[in-house]
Amino acid sequence: MALANSRPLQIPTLENEILHNSNSPVFQLNSMGFTTRADTISNPGTDLIGNQPGMALDDNNLAGSSFSSSQEIKATKPKKDFGAPKKDNPLLEISKLIPVTGERPKPENRDSPLDDDVLHAVFLILWEMDPNQQGMTVKQLCDLLLQKHPDMSNLSTKLSNLISAKLNAYVKKIEKGEKTLTYALSREWSNSSPRRMLYIYRGILSPDYKEHAQAVTMQLKQQLETSGDTSDFNSNGKKKRESSSNQLVNNDSYSSSMTDMKNMSSNSSFSKNLNVGNLAFSLSPEFNIPYSTSPVSLNLSPSMSNNQQQLLTPNSASKSKNNNKKRNYMDEDTNESMTEPKKTKTTKPGKQTKSQSLSVLSTPKKGSSASLSTFASSKNISPDSSLSHNASSNTYVTAAAAAPRLSKLLPKNGFKKNSRSSSELAAIHKVISTQTPIESSSESSQYNSSSSSPVNSAAASSAESLSDINSSQDNGRESNPSSQESRNEVTNWMKIVRNGFLTHDIESPESITLDDLENIFN
């Protein structure tokens, strides 16, 4: 059907000025019957090259547009300069600067470290095959070694690594200046590509080479430090300033966080014992012992008259309750070491506060806000009040309840046993096991039955709970002392509380020596 078309095919001729490109046979899309809009859409780069209205179209520019653009892209990419030499470590020059006597004999001395067969064979190869001291690579040494000693192929799966390790170790001994060495060996990088390490046998070392080696080492290290500082200052000056500013910001945030941490730790109950505020020295849970504190501040001196009876106001009661929170927290941790019977709960009207659950000996829940210190310091409790609730048991307070004990947070193995720690623990256990409970039946003042204050009622309930606990612990122990003996026992008990529970003082953690500290943790 194409041959039957009567319309002749329009073939462009040379008269068309668009086809006057004689440099290269580039197909021009403009020569066909398309519009300029279609040309712009199909070849949008023509407007960028300079084909603007009113300008003559340069076919050479159009022909070389793609090639020139690719050349510009290649020119923007940085080229690697493979011919630039690498910066050598100046410390590698130490072995070349070691003084020698000038003699280069055959290495026949088999003293250490040349008592090694591989190293001695390598030295012989260097002496024989490198008389001009041009240096030999590990590959060359390995090939020659296998030719002369085929049995050494079984020494290692890769003999070249073994040879390189032995040679480098020998060179480092020379750089350190060991006096046992006799022969000089140096190493340097080759100028060929790829660069290889060359080893050179230089002869016999001079007698005073040790001093020269140390002096050269110090000089090269100083030179390396100064050159490194100068280059860093020139190239990374801006980065250092930025990093210093960032470091200042980080230091500010760090100091603020440390301040918050110190404030938080100062409010905690462990800040005094565990020394959390001191970031340079923090104590582990092994030191959770009240060294210089007074865990029990009870005034148990006998009252001889009714005039000494005192009642606490609600303000003073709440104040003493707040002061005992930190002590109560520590006593709760240590109460598990003593076997206590299950406590009975008393049901009384009133709301229960959080501070009541932090009592010293985990007393039962009660309606008033009085704590154990309120009960102990009221000094107006007689055995009549306790007998009204529990007639079968006497009311007393044991000193062992507040004795310094190790924390339950200790690891299972505990301290490492030595004479000092064993004696201290034995003294603690002795006081706890031999402490005699103090009965308050004869030394207390006469009880005023008409008094019905909430403090007295709370004290009575506390006395009942304490009598139940201590009577179960000391079951079978019967004592009926007279009033004079009881008064003496109270005085002795007060001395024990005020002077401490141990036969000798426990030193504070700050006064411990390094040897004792090492014995504790090891």
From Swiss-Prot:
Residues 368-378, 439-467 have a biased composition (Low complexity). Residues 62-73, 222-236, 244-260, 300-314, 355-366, 379-391, 468-489 have a biased composition (Polar residues). One of its GO terms (molecular function) is NuA4 histone acetyltransferase complex binding. It holds the Pfam family WH_GDS1. GO terms for biological process: aerobic respiration. Residues 74-88 have a biased composition (Basic and acidic residues). GO terms for cellular component: cytoplasm; mitochondrion; nucleus. Disruption phenotype: Impairs growth on glycerol carbon source. Residues 56-88, 222-268, 300-391, 433-489 are annotated as: Disordered. Signal peptide: none annotated. Involved in nuclear control of mitochondria. Present with 2280 molecules/cell in log phase SD medium. This is Protein GDS1. It comes from Saccharomyces cerevisiae (strain ATCC 204508 / S288c) (Baker's yeast).
